[in-house]
Amino acid sequence: MTELVQQLLVDDADEELGWQERALCAQTDPESFFPEKGGSTREAKKVCLACEVRSECLEYALANDERFGIWGGLSERERRRLKKAAV
């Protein structure tokens, strides 16, 4: 019984994060999604605009309080503003 419960938990976790396998950023240079301070985010955001899992990515970043990088097409500052506007 315990093995079954553990497998169900693993399956649920895999399903929740399955969108990451379909993310376009997984096929590109991760450095562009985590630019140095003052660096350009243009290329990363361009990739996000064409990505089919953009909304799942943004939801994940907001739910997990991701503080670095471009997630769902938004920078950390843009995500912070979005959270404030939602409250």
Swiss-Prot record:
- Extract the coiled-coil ranges from the record: none
Q: Which cofactor does it need?
A: [4Fe-4S] cluster
Record-level GO cellular component terms:
cytoplasm
Positions contributing to [4Fe-4S] cluster binding: 25, 48, 51, 57
> Which molecular function term from Gene Ontology is one that the record holds?
protein-disulfide reductase [NAD(P)H] activity
Print the keywords alphabetically: 4Fe-4S, Cytoplasm, Disulfide bond, DNA-binding, Iron, Iron-sulfur, Metal-binding, Sporulation, Transcription, Transcription regulation
Where is it located?
Cytoplasm
According to the entry, every stretch annotated as the 4Fe-4S Wbl-type domain falls at: 24-81
HAMAP family reported for this sequence: WhiB
Q: What does this protein do?
A: Acts as a transcriptional regulator. Probably redox-responsive. The apo- but not holo-form probably binds DNA. Complements a whiB2 disruption mutant in M.smegmatis (AC Q9S426).
Name of protein: Transcriptional regulator WhiB
